[in-house]
A protein has these predicted regions:
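Single conserved hydrophobic/aromatic residue that forms the stacking wall/gate
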Residues: 138-147
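Intrinsically disordered, low-complexity regulatory segments
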Residues: 1-139
Length: 147
């Protein structure tokens, strides 16, 4: 089984149609030896300054250069501070399940730095060790499947 991950659901649906992954599931499409899942923008972000021991953050605190940067699920405002976005947590769980069932991953996020970052943050956050290849060009079967 091969996983494909896109930056947004609309692209995932287009790719799934092209490769014959027509079975709809919660958070992904499957079929014909493929599982196609998606992010919806930046699901993972760098931790806030407080996570690195910087209290009462001010401009004078910059730059913040911790020994290791922490990746966390996208945050939303809560009553007191911020909390992980429940929709993001759900999709991350589904992406992990897809990755766990597959032998390799084809990255079909948008071309450029942002698309690359969206995938790599997810990949590292999930501690995934599967091999992956990047397909950034056109929505044609040979380029999607890296044939």
């Amino acid at each position: 089984m091969i996983a494909l991950i896109t930056e947004k659901p609309s692209v995932a649906k287009d790719i799934a149609r092209i490769i014959g992954a027509t079975q709809r599931n919660d958070g992904y499409l499957s079929g014909n030896g493929y599982m196609v899942t998606w992010a919806f923008g930046h699901l993972i972000q760098l931790a806030m300054p407080e996570a690195y021991g910087v209290a009462n953050f001010r401009r004078e605190s910059l730059p913040i250069l911790p020994p290791d940067f922490q990746l966390i699920p996208r945050q939303v405002k809560a009553e007191k501070g911020y909390k992980a976005d429940p929709g993001v947590l759900k999709q991350l769980k589904l992406i992990k399940e897809v990755f766990d069932q597959c032998d390799r991953i084809i990255v079909a996020t948008d071309a450029g730095r942002e698309g690359e970052l969206i995938f790599r943050y997810i990949f590292h956050y999930l501690n995934c060790r599967k091999p992956f290849a990047v397909s950034y060009t056109h929505l044609t079967l040979p380029t999607i499947l890296l044939v």
